[in-house]
Amino acid sequence: MIRISQLKLPITHTKAQLEKKIAKTLKNPGNSFTYEIRKQSLDCRHKNDKIFVYTVDVTIRDEQKLAKKVNNNNIMLTKEKPYEFPSPGETPLLHSPVIVGSGPAGLFCGWYLAKAGYCPIILERGEEAEKRQKTVENFWKNGVLDPESNVQFGEGGAGTFSDGKLNTLVKDPYGRNHEVLKRFVAAGAPEEIIYQQKPHLGTDVLVGIVEKMRHEIEEMGGKFCFRSKVTDLIFENNTLKEIEINNDKRIPAQVCVLAPGHSARDTFEMLQKRGVYMEPKSFAVGLRIEHPQEMINMDLYGEPENELLGAASYKVTHKCANGRGVYSFCMCPGGYVVNASSEPGRLAVNGMSYQARDSRNANSAMIVTVTPEDFPDKGVLGGVEFQRDLEKKAWELGEGKIPVQLFGDFCKNQASEALGEVTPCMKGEYILTNVRSVLPKAVGDSIEEGVRAFGKRVSGFDREDALLSGIESRTSSPVRIVRDQELTANMAGIYPCGEGAGYAGGITSAAMDGIKVAETVCRKYAAIKNN
């Protein structure tokens, strides 16, 4: 196989033009070939000459001879190494492995274990995706919160109500990233996510994908139990024996994959009581910021709209004078700010986009790093307490509604009384107030400095009527459930997994970690179906 990089074409190019470019690069006017796009990125440095840059893998006769003949630094011989799931181990499994949580980590762990014959049981505290969607929409419309099935909990995890970004910075020598993307495509995602620089799915597409993955897992011998919150783990001699569900039913368990999500605070409390080792970790908190999507498009594309490219995105970071980092997070082009609360009397927000990314606003979190030093002497769950305190203040400030403030008023530390040209795109009720009043001083100062700095990079970013809303507190897990080289906790049979356990950040990396844990379980234990 020959890999060609730096193939540059206008954004209006056709498939035939790409194929012609490949043939010309290989100096191959006649021989037939097949190709697969490995990467597509956008170069907008010249607004009037926007281009796509491709990396493609080409299969053609006499590849070695051809590669030497062409003598081009952008051409190299390569050999694709397909992903391989390990063969089963020999230790007998007396009971089906139990997976706690059906977010990306739990779903992918479950899918691969089911395919290998392990008949996993997946316990999910929330509802099936279709029921959960109705519950969440009712919450946004009527303010009735279900603490067990909401934006954070339920089939698909917190990522179901997000932009559905699939890019990751995790190094992947084993091919798990590509495997995750292929699995999404097989479940209904568009094929372009395989090679796009910034692939995304959107909430509307994600719901259908997780439903299909559930059905596939069930067809392969897996079982789902919804409205089934794990309330206790029973150990004997530091070894898992049983799992308690809903403070009532107990099931025997030998293997438990813990993939509870980053908001499973009651689960973290239970683990602490049971002696499972955890450690506090750094995370970030802040606010959402909204701008007109056309403004962001103008800055990147040089035009307010481009049908070929869709809504533009940005990624910005800044090191503040106080030493803290402030940066954009979970940027949602053409998206919505959503009420993402999961606990009564507390309020959190998140960003969400549908696949079309066609709302009038762009939004992103403006978040500031916090470390365990910001909540000293609070113990392992100090970060949880820190989050809860901010969310309680936000709920009280907005009387249960999303608190919103214009950036100009934020800088003056005064309540907003009227909107400017930017009007909110939100799911859930909002109220104008002084959002800054709920933030720690260091966080508020950092956001103000950061937005000012970003205004020098993205024209209009620091406009007075940009909208800030909060609080964005669920960026990542505030704890890490400690695991060893065998991916097990200090209690035998427990496999911490995914974002909630502190080993991922986003849909793709969580799914990859789910596969990684499934591999580990498989290497040790014999499959159920073969017993």
Where are each of the predicted segments found?
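Residues forming the flavin
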Residues: 1-52, 56-531
